[in-house]
């Protein structure tokens, strides 16, 4: 189905090539994305390891939204899906439902990602290993050879590894980082800023999980939060009480950025789509379909921890006025130079939310209307209002949102396990080795928790 180009249908990764001048038209930008593809090889571990399945399903879900040439999987056996990401189905069916294609032969021109023990694979010159251990995860080029133990001790790690690999593949295709495909890239969620390849004996095995959360905003970040919650080893998913707050509807463009959005859900309320997805995985959800702002007040019986993923400075500046004892906010950059940027803030902190964001409320975004792609649209007859709306949309890719969501979610898990509390974390997926942060003293986590299944993983409800 061909959709009229407007701000609701614009592919947000295509916008990067339009805004940067790499593509002279929207059609040229889409043609570029349609040349991007990925071959994923899976090892024998995929049959019995939920961690490896999480890595596979995550990288398929993330990359198929930006690599429009296709995502193909080699070595996929007939076996059950072991996680709540794809309940009551086979793994092949789960991969296909997310947009991947099981194949027997690789396309030689596509780069390669390896998950598990794979010995025979194509395109060894442009290939990454998706790897993790404990709270650390990333992607390592095969030419370098680094590999971690790929254990089951921390549920977020394989998802983080998949997202990092997706980012490296995109940079390889975009040609905007000379080291993409020639460097390792990763993060420690226990010690942000530490070398992710170094063994860290202080990392605990995941033992506790939050039991009450309020998610504000259900776009790119909010849907990434939901995806990660489904990875968590809740013995009884119903123990997690979730308030889901968003007033917006799904647009076709959300398919390019948000992990639970599909074009067939266009015009459905985001909160209802996300709630339905979580309900099917056994969680308990409550919907709040109104804007967040200074008028929002939490009741004492409602979740005391808020995960915020809105991109609105006015809403952000009111975060600490709603009565939440703990808030973890995640934000993303938006322009062609900043779309890989991410930031995490927690409250209470040394600054109020208004001090951080009030000045951004009235700031105007830098215009890209003079770039060739927008001038081509102007010549094609698009009106001035439509052109301004298109130019004002942010560049967006799902792997940045998922990495930011991993950092936000790990803030809760770290505090639950007696680790450091961070006031802010800032960085870019292009330079994960240069994460900046500030720590603070925080009281013990007292906002509701449940025990994780020991060395376990979620199973389909």
From Swiss-Prot:
Protein name: Bacterial E1-like protein BilD
Organism, scientific name: Collimonas sp. (strain OK412)
A single GO molecular function term of this UniProt record: ubiquitin-like modifier activating enzyme activity
UniProt-listed SUPFAM superfamilies: Activating enzymes of the ubiquitin-like proteins
Cited function: Component of the Bil (bacterial ISG15-like) antiviral defense system, composed of BilA, BilB, BilC and BilD. The Bil system specifically conjugates a ubiquitin-like moiety (bilA) to the bacteriophage central tail fiber (CTF, or tip attachment protein J) via reactions involving E1 (bilD) and E2 (bilB). Modifies CTF of phage SECphi27 and SECphi4, which probably interferes with assembly of the phage tail. Also modifies T5 baseplate hub protein pb3 (gene D16), but not gp27 of phage T6 (Bil defends against T6). BilD (E1) catalyzes the first step in conjugation.
GO terms for biological process, alphabetical: defense response to virus; protein modification by small protein conjugation
Keywords assigned: Antiviral defense, Ligase, Thioester bond, Ubl conjugation pathway
Keyword Ligase among record annotations: yes
Top-level taxon: Bacteria
Active site residues of this protein: 385 (glycyl thioester intermediate)
Listed InterPro entries: Ubiquitin-activating_enz
EC number: 6.2.1.-
């Amino acid at each position: 189905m061909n959709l009229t180009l407007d701000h609701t249908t614009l592919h947000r990764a295509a916008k990067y090539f339009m805004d940067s001048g790499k593509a002279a038209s929207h059609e040229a930008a889409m043609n570029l994305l349609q040349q991007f593809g990925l071959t994923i090889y899976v090892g024998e571990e995929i049959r019995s390891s939920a961690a490896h399945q999480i890595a596979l399903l995550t990288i398929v879900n993330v990359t198929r939204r930006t690599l429009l040439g296709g995502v193909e999987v080699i070595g996929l056996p007939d076996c059950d899906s072991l996680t709540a990401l794809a309940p009551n189905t086979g793994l092949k069916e789960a991969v296909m439902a997310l947009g991947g294609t099981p194949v027997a032969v690789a396309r030689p021109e596509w780069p390669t990602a390896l998950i598990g023990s794979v010995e025979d694979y194509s395109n060894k010159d442009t290939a990454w290993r998706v790897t993790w251990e404990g709270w650390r995860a990333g992607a390592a080029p095969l030419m370098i050879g680094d590999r971690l133990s790929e254990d089951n001790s921390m549920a977020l790690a394989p998802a983080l590894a998949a997202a990092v690999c997706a980012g490296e593949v995109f940079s390889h295709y975009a040609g905007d980082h000379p080291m993409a495909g020639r460097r390792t890239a990763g993060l420690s969620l226990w010690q942000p800023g530490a070398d992710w390849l170094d063994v860290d004996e202080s990392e605990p095995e995941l033992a506790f999980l939050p039991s009450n959360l309020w998610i504000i905003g259900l776009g790119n970040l909010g849907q990434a939060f939901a995806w990660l919650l489904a990875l968590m080893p809740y013995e009884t998913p119903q123990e997690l009480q979730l308030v889901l707050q968003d007033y917006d509807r799904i647009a076709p463009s959300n398919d390019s950025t948000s992990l639970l959005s599909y074009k067939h859900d266009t015009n459905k309320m985001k909160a209802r789509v996300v709630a339905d997805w979580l309900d099917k995985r056994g969680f308990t959800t409550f919907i709040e379909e109104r804007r967040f702002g200074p008028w929002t007040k939490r009741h004492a019986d409602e979740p005391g921890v808020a995960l915020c993923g809105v991109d609105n400075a006015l809403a952000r500046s009111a975060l600490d006025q709603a009565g939440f004892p703990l808030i973890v906010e995640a934000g993303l950059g938006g322009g062609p130079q900043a779309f890989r940027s991410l930031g995490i803030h927690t409250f209470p902190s040394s600054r109020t939310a208004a001090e951080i964001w009030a000045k951004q409320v009235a700031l105007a975004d830098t215009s890209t209307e003079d770039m060739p792609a927008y001038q081509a649209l102007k010549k094609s007859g698009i009106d001035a209002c439509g052109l301004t709306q298109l130019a004002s949309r942010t560049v967006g890719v799902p792997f940045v949102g998922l990495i930011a969501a991993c950092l936000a979610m790990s803030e809760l898990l770290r505090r639950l396990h007696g680790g450091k509390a961070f006031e802010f974390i800032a960085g870019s997926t292009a330079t994960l080795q240069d994460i900046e942060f500030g720590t603070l003293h925080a009281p013990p986590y007292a906002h509701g928790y449940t025990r994780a299944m020991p060395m376990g993983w979620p199973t389909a409800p």
